[in-house]
């Protein structure tokens, strides 16, 4: 039995969240009556309202109105007034991942998992399948610039979704094809241990049907170890590793883009295909690897090499993934969602390869628990930045943890040899700090999952205003 075509109004609590908004948009496009509320009138709420979806700012019991089904994210507390009213009325309440799983049953599905790179890889898979005429439905964890949204309703057989492992609910997703980009210690507040995270990813792969397959990056040692423990499922490996089935070769990261070639070797004796002169207009080896994963899926689904080449070259990127927000005095300012040490290191490495100038990193640590559990990694992931400006921790509702804050991170960076790490007292002081640091050819990279994105977009104008005052 699949999701009925006729359901009463479906109410999303937290509809402005990136995952919730995508599901709501697709369900609206399928003809369901959708409504929802969020604490803030953010970009996603406004976008959904423009599409004709009824939205409410603030959570109140009366918002449910005639709703017959309620969808909630894991961020919603049990004492939320709308959730309490739904339970008082004995309405069905489903988690975000459960509703996504129901939507996936309408299509054949590619699910993209991994600690890092999910959103970009999901976008790349969607772009390549679209270029191959497969017209996929897409539900992503970030805004795909070419679509202006994180969700797209296609007419084709395939759906491409980002599989969020943060609360373990990605195990509910019925994928035919799975991608695993990497596996690192993250979301330990939910899983409790790294071993539990690895077990969850193994279960994710084991859930694939016998006629499906998994695409896994064996450049990452934990993923390579997992490949060795998977039985009875078809695995396609990718990476720079010489043993990879789909091998990334000759990566050139100069000029703010990635040039590379890919060699595909099937387990069939003698089968070999080389794709040369591939260009992705995004910097960083991590993005070249993401593109290689997407290429592996597209090739398996019959997308022609020339269509893959054109689609990669025209890829418009994803919002908050090395997104250029402006320029001042010849220096480029970027916004990036990177908030885990592995992500920060990859982004700064990409920035370093893309410019001959200086790289200034502005970081807003996200959550005290993350800073505490990965503190040593945070202290050593900024080596490619000439200067690190550290803002106060974005708490995301957490209580402070003694010994893990902005100042201890600055001290930790310095004690491990970084030559220029400074504390930012207030966001209003950022332009003044940056003003004395950058010139033509330099990069300023704003990093974090909090509200630092607003600073990144405001910074070019604030720097210009400072310059006008000085004149």
From Swiss-Prot:
Keyword Ligase: yes
EC number: 6.3.2.8
Catalytic activity of the protein: UDP-N-acetyl-alpha-D-muramate + L-alanine + ATP = UDP-N-acetyl-alpha-D-muramoyl-L-alanine + ADP + phosphate + H(+)
Protein's GO biological process: cell division; cell wall organization; peptidoglycan biosynthetic process; regulation of cell shape
Pathway(s) annotated for this protein in UniProt: Cell wall biogenesis; peptidoglycan biosynthesis
Binding, ATP: 114-120
Membership in a protein family: Belongs to the MurCDEF family.
Record PANTHER family: UDP-N-ACETYLMURAMATE--L-ALANINE LIGASE (PTHR43445:SF3), UDP-N-ACETYLMURAMATE--L-ALANINE LIGASE-RELATED (PTHR43445)
Record protein name field: UDP-N-acetylmuramate--L-alanine ligase
Gene name of the encoded protein: murC
